[in-house]
Amino acid sequence: MNISSLRKAFIFMGAVAALSLVNAQSALAANESAKDMTCQEFIDLNPKAMTPVAWWMLHEETVYKGGDTVTLNETDLTQIPKVIEYCKKNPQKNLYTFKNQASNDLPN
């Protein structure tokens, strides 16, 4: 094996190792959920990502009395602005504190 081939092999192995580290980091980030997100992290999101995150948070494990459901459009128009306003006023709180507060305000 000459030096040129050895150099190419080291470069290839370095690239594979770097990609493996990036993928491992992405997998760790994917395991975190909105349950761990603070309001400040929510506000710092790209505005296009706020609606799906808030919608998922509001509807995760939500059971309505009588099996009632709410469409995405109705939720976006009524709850998403309230989540954003709440988080701007309470950046240090966990995002799920809004859901807990909202469930206490709504009749079951």
Curated annotation (Swiss-Prot):
Principal location listed in the UniProt entry: periplasm
Extra facts: In vitro, HdeA is more efficient than HdeB at pH 2 and HdeB is more efficient than HdeA at pH 3. In vivo, both are required for optimal protection against acid stress at either pH 3 or pH 2.
Gene source species: Escherichia coli (strain K12)
Induction: Induced by the EvgS/EvgA two-component regulatory system. Negatively regulated by H-NS and the TorS/TorR two-component regulatory system.
Entry protein name: Acid stress chaperone HdeB
Presence of the UniProt keyword Ubl conjugation in the record: no
Pfam families attached to this UniProt entry: HdeA
Keywords: Acetylation, Chaperone, Periplasm, Signal
Annotated signal peptide: 1-29
Phenotype of gene-disrupted mutants: Mutants display increased sensitivity to acid stress at pH 2 and pH 3.
